[in-house]
């Protein structure tokens, strides 16, 4: 999550660009679920955004969300070294609405299938505001299209168990709410927080 001014600052790093729109207007306003990529390594082939709501093609809140518009930005990329094509989706789910989080998972799966199909290599990352046993994550896992990289690491996982500390720097991070989902056939060499 980042605001345009923050993202533009990061993009000043040599050789990087980003895609993604502001969640409030589909342009620059509000937080972005941006995707940064190294331009010397990857070609951007296509890109887009959708909102986690009943009207995903226009900015808005969905279902029982009360706070903010929530957005997913995606890109289709080609690796210049291998020639392989893949899709990358970056999401931020609502932090209050249970129905919104569940329906967001259903919408994410539907949009991945619509945009990338079922045989493409896909990475789906983000702040899902849900622990692995919560309904939104169970919904993603039970569909079978996406696999949680946490479970696929070839090497033992390291770092903290969780990814969220309630903004308390001295607290133990036990709640995992940020994920990297991948499609079948994706090799996960390491997993760390």
Language-model regions, residue ranges each:
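Solvent-exposed, acidic/flexible segments
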Residues: 1-3, 29, 68, 98-105, ...
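Divalent metal-dependent phosphoesterase catalytic cores across multiple superfamilies
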Residues: 1-16, 100-118
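Structured beta-strand-rich core segments of catalytic domains in phosphoester-bond hydrolases
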Residues: 2-85, 192-193
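Loop/turn elements at helix/coil->beta-strand transitions in domains of secreted/extracellular proteins
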Residues: 13-18, 82-87, 117-122, 144-147
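Glycine-/small-residue-rich active-site loops that bind phosphorylated ligands and cofactors
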Residues: 24-28, 96, 129
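Active-site metal-binding loops of divalent metal-dependent hydrolases
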Residues: 91-93, 126-128
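Metal-dependent phosphoester-hydrolase catalytic domains
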Residues: 99, 103, 110-122, 130-193
């Amino acid at each position: 999550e980042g605001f345009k001014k923050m993202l533009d600052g990061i993009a000043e790093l040599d050789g990087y660009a980003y895609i993604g729109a502001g969640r409030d207007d589909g342009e620059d306003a509000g937080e972005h679920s941006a995707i940064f990529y190294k331009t010397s390594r990857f070609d951007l082939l296509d890109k887009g955004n959708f909102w986690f709501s009943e009207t995903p093609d226009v900015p808005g809140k969905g279902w029982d969300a009360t706070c903010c518009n929530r957005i997913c930005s995606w890109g289709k990329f080609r690796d210049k070294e291998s020639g392989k094509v893949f899709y990358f989706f970056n999401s931020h789910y609502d932090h209050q609405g249970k129905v919104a989080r569940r329906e967001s998972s259903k919408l994410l799966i539907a949009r991945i299938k619509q945009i990338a199909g079922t045989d493409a290599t896909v990475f789906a990352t983000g702040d899902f505001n849900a622990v692995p046993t919560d309904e939104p994550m169970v919904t993603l896992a039970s569909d079978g299209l996406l696999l949680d990289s946490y479970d696929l690491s070839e090497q033992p996982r390291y770092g903290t168990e969780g990814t969220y500390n309630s903004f308390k720097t001295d607290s133990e991070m036990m709640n995992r709410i940020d994920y990297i989902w991948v499609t079948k056939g994706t090799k996960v060499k390491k997993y760390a927080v």
